[in-house]
A protein has these predicted regions:
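N-terminal amphipathic alpha-helix/helix-capping segment at the start of soluble metabolic enzymes
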Residues: 1-8, 82
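Hydrophobic faces of well-ordered beta-strands that scaffold small-molecule active sites
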Residues: 6-8, 35-39, 96-99, 107
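Conserved, mostly hydrophobic/aromatic
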Residues: 9, 28
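Active-site beta-loop-alpha junctions enriched in small/polar residues
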Residues: 11-13, 40-44, 101-103
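Glycine-rich anion/phosphate-binding loops
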Residues: 15-27, 79-80
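Non-catalytic positions within long, well-ordered alpha-helices that form the structural scaffold/packing
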Residues: 29-33, 90
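Glycine-rich, proline-tolerant flexible connector loops at the mouths of alpha/beta enzymes
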Residues: 35-76
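Active-site beta->alpha loop and helix N-cap motifs at the rims of alpha/beta catalytic domains
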Residues: 59-107
């Protein structure tokens, strides 16, 4: 019988901070014994319409920018930061995964 893989969905709960993201990976590995961590990747300009991007965050208290677009951009990591997280995962022995929300992010 094949053992199922346990995946920890980290998504954007790292608050746009690479060190928080890496700490979440380490915590998932150490305390939850998961096999895989999963993040998300979006190209905000592909993902949001101009109107959505320029609108305020629906819950201003939780926003990392003046607009929803700025908020979403703040939470996104660059390709180099994705590589840094992948290297951290390799170092501690956990699989890295990222779901993409648009074609540009997949390329």
């Amino acid at each position: 019988m094949v053992k199922p893989k346990i995946i920890a969905e980290i998504g954007c709960n790292h608050k746009g901070n690479i060190e928080i993201a890496k700490a979440m990976v380490s915590t998932a590995k150490t305390y939850c014994n998961v096999d895989v961590v999963k993040f998300q990747k979006r190209d905000i300009k592909s993902f949001l319409s101009t109107n959505e991007s320029n609108s305020p965050h629906p819950v201003a208290y939780n926003s990392y920018g003046k607009t929803y677009g700025e908020h979403r951009e703040f939470l996104e990591f660059s390709i180099d930061q994705h590589k840094e997280r992948k290297n951290h995962c390799d170092k501690i022995g956990i699989e890295y995964s990222s779901s993409v929300w648009d074609l540009k992010s997949a390329l």
